[in-house]
Amino acid sequence: MAMALQIIASSSSSPTITKSHLFSYPPLQSRYKASKPNLSSWFSLLGSSRFSPYIGLKHLGISISPKSSNPEKKRRCKSMMIRASLFGVGAPEALVIGVVALLVFGPKGLAEVARNLGKTLRTFQPTIRELQDVSRDFKSTLEREIGLDDISTPNVYNQNRTNPVQPPPPPPPPSVPSTEAPVTANDPNDSQSPKAYTSEDYLKFTEEQLKALSPAESQTEDQTQTQEPPQPTTVQTPTGESQPNGTARETTAASPPRQD
């Protein structure tokens, strides 16, 4: 404060202050030099430990407990809270319900109500156990199915990665009818490939074959006629017996004429 008052007094006495006057002010330089060892002592106290924002607050006298980021502890606390509650009703809620029941039924009525509740619970105890068993079985089956689904999905993903889906082959191009004549296989002895025959060529070949067959048929007929021997003609005699032509002549020549 004294330093500030001196600066104000000097400014009021002389409105213009030079830079050399400010930098040569003795109290500021002494204060700045005195602050250096304090910083070095701070860093020596810290040492080689890890720097955290709470260390400086501890030196100032302020203590802040850092929040724990352990999820396991949170889960344990939640499970303890769930175990402490009965059917979703905790200890304070149960106490409030008991006080209200005492006010409504009274001590005698509350005892009777508790007895009736005990009897009903005893009667329904086997059914409750059956329901618990059914719920456990259902829960186990659900967990198994979920586990199988979780196991099958990575297997399918790995199979898809190892065996990528191949694209379907492209469809074959449409067949275009060829206008060119079919080319037959070349014989090794032929130097030129034979050309395709037209309908006129086929007609010529058939006519030539018919002409070649007609003289062959006539020759075969002549040969069959020459090979067959001449059959003798039969002549009937006056006696009524049939004789060949040559024998009839001989008999006529040999037999004398009849005289009446």
UniProtKB/Swiss-Prot annotation:
Lumenal side: 84-85
Example GO biological process: protein import into chloroplast thylakoid membrane
GO molecular function terms listed in the Swiss-Prot or TrEMBL record: proton motive force dependent protein transmembrane transporter activity
Keywords (A to Z) from UniProt: Chloroplast, Membrane, Plastid, Protein transport, Thylakoid, Transit peptide, Translocation, Transmembrane, Transmembrane helix, Transport
S-S bonds: none
One Gene Ontology CC term in the entry: plastid
Bilayer-spanning residue ranges: 86-106
Location of this chain's protein in the cell: Plastid, Chloroplast thylakoid membrane
Keyword Transport set for record: yes
InterPro entries given in the database record: TatA/B/E (IPR003369), TatA/E (IPR006312)
Compositionally biased intervals (Low complexity): 221-239
Family affiliation: Belongs to the TatB family.
Subunit structure: In thylakoid membranes, TATC and TATB form a large receptor complex, containing about eight TATC-TATB pairs, which binds the precursor protein. Twin arginine signal peptide promotes pH-triggered docking of TATA oligomers to TATC-TATB receptor complex, inducing a conformational switch of TATA that results in activation of the translocase. TATA dissociates from TATC-TATB upon completion of translocation.
Official protein name in the record: Sec-independent protein translocase protein TATB, chloroplastic
Protein's organism: Arabidopsis thaliana
Lineage: Eukaryota, Viridiplantae, Streptophyta, Embryophyta, Tracheophyta
